Curated annotation (Swiss-Prot):
Belongs to the peptidase M10A family. Its EC number is 3.4.24.-. Hemopexin repeats lie at residues 286-333, 334-372, 377-425, 426-471. It is an enzyme of class 3 (hydrolase). Residues 19-98, 513-527 form a propeptide. Keywords: Angiogenesis, Calcium, Cell membrane, Collagen degradation, Developmental protein, Differentiation, Disulfide bond, Extracellular matrix, Glycoprotein, GPI-anchor, Hydrolase, Lipoprotein, Membrane, Metal-binding, Metalloprotease, Phosphoprotein, Protease, Repeat, Secreted, Signal, Zinc, Zymogen. The gene is Mmp19. GO terms for molecular function: metalloendopeptidase activity; zinc ion binding. Transmembrane segments: none annotated. It comes from the Eukaryota. Zn(2+) binds at C86, H213, H217, H223. The active site is at E214. This is Matrix metalloproteinase-19. The lineage of its organism: Eukaryota, Metazoa, Chordata, Craniata, Vertebrata.
Length: 527
């Protein structure tokens, strides 16, 4: 780090065991304080750290760790910094030891899904450990957790290595960072697959305890200054008779309230039921990195969804997400769609197929749907929402219709030629959408077009759709003759049927900052 080199040797007169720390050790200390939120990098000037800022950061860390408070680097402080811990920051900037709150879910009945397991534990032991991790919280707060084995889940748990392409905060190998999690309503929990994950022994890293800690984050709890609390940032080791610390209990109850004793027995019987995967036999599984899509939509939760055949996947900056059966996310929705469009104006998603339309709010079908949609030609090619006039555009062949969801629209003047409004766009597009960057995109075959503010095709387009899907060098290894993703046997992936396809599975967070991937060499298991 260049900004450290100018002052590192002069600013930090730190010693350990009577000897002065070298530049590399000092840099590691500063990196730690910066990484976990004890020290803030100056906004202006690369060498503007003040000695008092670093001293205060060390004092805060020592206080939060239950160490003698000196503001100096000593043996105990150095040892504490080397302990395995959670990857989230410690926003300790107040004197109170009270729990920290990061937000909460707007519902209390949550689903979770286990995507893979480490090589050191069997599937039954992993499942038992994770179920117990959730149960610690549901035993003291009015929360229920239900495991699902396919489709969307509120909380998604997975194991990643150093080179995971779909996890923005990559892990560092054995020791140091053990796991990290998203805040509420994002829902990703990632574990370092290189740790020696164990259960029922003092050796290795106890999966049950670490998972319970990360679930606490996923429910909205920050780190606790009580070193004996589950939500303390540093791993305290295996505890065979573990119970939540009073600070953990107070924090979760501040978010969700107390669990009612009279409903406890009833909920205990139902909270860990599992939901079986969809059993209907789907069509062939597509490769997201080849071929055209049936529809594309910037949908609920700000995620980009691509549809092909009976499957849907999310598109992230790190590549295509997992393939789900469409009906697993939107119950009652068929595959092989003609078009789809999400309207931020009404928060409704409309899907078109033949002469019918399906309407969903989030992932729930509206009453009375599907219904016939005879006001335009059947078998549409594409649809998009245009934020400029808050209208929905429907495309078929070389023409388009402009439809107002909330008002009676006179469609007798349509269709109008696509080229009169969207210059340079091909006829019969397979998909279209307005995206987060405010631009309009059209897709056809293996190409896509971006339009500028004048609704003309931008320079450099069309481009290959693999660029849009962020495939490129991130594309999983494929069989050169079939294009199928090549499986193997390093990790265990859950919730899919045995197949030679789809060995890359990803559930991105709502921010697309933490999504999950499994490298090549995976064994796919039926749920």
């Amino acid at each position: 780090m260049d900004w450290q080199q100018l002052w590192l040797a002069f600013l930090l007169p730190m010693t350990v065991s009577g000897r002065a720390l070298g530049p590399t050790e000092k840099e590691a200390v500063l990196d730690y304080l910066l990484q976990y939120g004890y020290l803030q990098k100056p906004l202006e000037g690369a060498d503007d750290f003040r000695l008092e800022d670093i001293t205060e950061a060390l004092r805060t860390f020592q206080e939060a760790s239950g160490l003698p408070i000196s503001g100096q680097m000593d043996d105990a402080t150095r040892a504490r910094m080397k302990q395995p811990r959670c990857g989230l920051e410690d926003p300790f900037n107040q004197k109170s030891l009270k729990y920290l709150l990061l937000g909460h879910w707007r519902k209390k009945n949550l689903t979770f899904r286990i995507f893979n397991v480490p090589s050191t534990l069997s599937l039954p032991r992993v499942r038992a450990a994770l179920h117990q991790a959730f149960k610690y919280w549901s035993s003291v707060a009015p929360l229920t957790f239900r495991e699902v084995k396919a489709g969307w889940a509120d909380i998604r748990l997975s194991f990643h290595g150093r080179q995971s392409l779909y996890c923005s905060n990559t892990f560092d190998g054995p020791g140091k960072v053990l796991a990290h999690a998203d805040i509420p309503e994002l829902g990703s929990i990632h574990f370092d697959k290189d740790e020696l994950w164990t259960e029922g022994t003092y050796q290795g890293v106890n999966l049950r305890i670490i998972a319970a800690h990360e679930v606490g984050h996923a429910l909205g709890l920050g780190h606790s200054r009580y070193t004996q609390a589950l939500m303390a940032p540093v791993y305290a080791g295996y505890q065979p008779f573990f119970k939540l610390h009073p600070d953990d209990v107070a924090g979760i109850q501040a978010l969700y309230g107390k669990r009612s004793p009279e409903t406890r027995d009833e909920e205990e019987e139902t909270e860990m039921l599992t939901v079986s995967p969809v059993t209907a036999k789907p069509g062939p599984m597509p490769n997201p990195c080849s071929g055209e899509v049936d529809a594309m939509v910037l949908g609920p939760r700000g995620k980009t969804y691509a549809f092909k055949g009976d499957y849907v996947w999310t598109v992230t900056d790190s590549g295509p997400g997992p393939l789900f059966q469409i009906s697993a996310l939107w119950e009652g929705l068929p595959g092989n769609l003609d078009a789809a469009v999400y309207s931020p104006r009404t928060r409704r998603t409309h899907f078109f197929k033949g002469n019918k339309v399906w309407r969903y709010v989030d992932f729930k079908m509206s009453p009375g749907f599907p219904m016939k949609f005879n006001r335009v030609e059947p078998n549409l090619d594409a649809a998009l929402y245009w934020p400029v006039n808050q209208k929905v555009f429907l495309f078929k062949g070389s023409g388009y219709w402009q439809w107002d969801e909330l008002a009676r629209t006179d469609l007798s003047r349509y269709p109008k030629p696509i080229k009169e409004l969207f210059t340079g766009v091909p006829d019969r597009p397979s998909a279209a959408m307005s995206w987060q960057d405010g631009q309009v995109y059209f897709f056809k075959g293996k190409e896509y077009w971006r339009l500028n503010q004048q609704l003309r095709v931008a320079k450099g387009y069309p481009r290959n759709t693999t660029h849009w899907m962020h495939c490129g060098s991130q594309t999983p290894d494929t069989n050169s003759s079939t294009g199928d993703v090549t499986p193997s046997t390093t990790d265990t992936v859950l919730g899919t049927t045995p197949s030679t396809m789809g060995s890359t599975l990803d559930i991105p967070s709502a921010t697309d900052s933490a999504s999950l991937s499994f490298s090549a060499n995976v064994t796919l298991l039926g749920a």
